Amino acid sequence: MLSVFVLPGGARAQTTTPQEWIEIGTRAHGGFGALIPIGIRIGLDALQRLKTSPRGVIVRYRSGETAPCPCVADGIMVATQASPGQGTLKVLDEKAGQGLLLDVEIEDRKTGATLRYRVASRWQPQVVTWNKTLDPLGRYQAVMAADAMIEPAGP
């Protein structure tokens, strides 16, 4: 089954509240587990650090050996508006390195500047706990407060 997700009129730019992210993430993914806000956080950070706008990036995503699914890619998609249909979001068959839950590269389409984000596998038990014990808003808040979770590298 293929789900199509469209943000009318560039809605992402105006979407700033946690509740709006939860609604969009749920619509795009079909649920709002803790992996979705991890992707949102990565996507927003990349747009800010690259000083680009939504649809201005190419995303290359790799899941780790123990990752349950590439759900984080859906969070990145809603934050950046990168899209498999546009060829700007690619979930690669190649796995992330040893000890990683995920490894993602986000490239500015105009400048070629690239950022890399990694989340260590040691975070997987915490993500599972958040999914079992917190509601969607609690998951969003927990991810946004977990400063050590996401390891960015690049410009």
Question: Where are the regions that the model predicts?
Answer:
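Sec/Tat signal peptide C-region and signal peptidase I cleavage site
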Residues: 9-13
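Non-transmembrane, aqueous-exposed alpha-helical and coiled segments at domain scale
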Residues: 14-32, 37-155
